[in-house]
Regions:
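N-terminal glycine-/serine-/threonine-rich beta1-alpha1-beta2 phosphate-ribose binding loop
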Residues: 1-83, 92, 96-107
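ATP-grasp fold ATP-binding core
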Residues: 86-88
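Predominantly a Rossmann-like dinucleotide-binding segment in NAD(P)-dependent oxidoreductases
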Residues: 104-135
Length: 135
């Protein structure tokens, strides 16, 4: 795992301690598991946490493109690519988003995007009966 920023509400360190996974100092180290070449079977890319500026349109300038470029660099240098899941949209900028999309075609890897929220644990647990009204 790699985290670009570690805000006060970050859970990565506690979860790493609890479940025994490593946190690396760079994206390259995380994808290579500290070695010299790509060593993972897939990438879950969540680029929407931390303190980043806003542009004149009020868009939060999360560095998804810049972080994704580092993932692509590792793929290119390793001579192989793996599936990437991008939490949320690719970028606030069409040109950057298009480049991100195009890389999956050029390097022949599956690229998925959406929200990871439906896949997270509910704390406390909550199971609603099918057809239950929700306010």
């Amino acid at each position: 795992m790699y985290t670009d920023q570690v805000p006060s509400n970050d859970m990565s360190r506690a979860l790493a301690s609890q479940y025994g996974f490593r946190i690396f100092g760079t994206i390259r180290e995380a994808l290579c598991l500290g070695g010299g070449t790509l060593a993972v079977d897939g990438v879950a890319f969540i680029g929407e946490h931390g303190e980043y500026p806003f542009n004149e349109k009020g868009q939060h300038l999360y560095p998804r493109y810049e972080l994704y470029k580092q993932i692509i660099d590792v793929f290119r240098e390793s001579g192989r690519a793996v599936a990437v899941y991008c939490d949320k949209h690719f970028s606030y900028d069409w040109t950057k988003a298009k480049w991100m999309y195009d890389q999956s075609h050029e390097l022949h890897f599956p690229l998925m995007a959406g929200s990871s929220v439906p896949l997270t644990w509910r704390r406390p647990p909550l199971e609603l009966e099918l057809g239950s009204p929700v306010d």
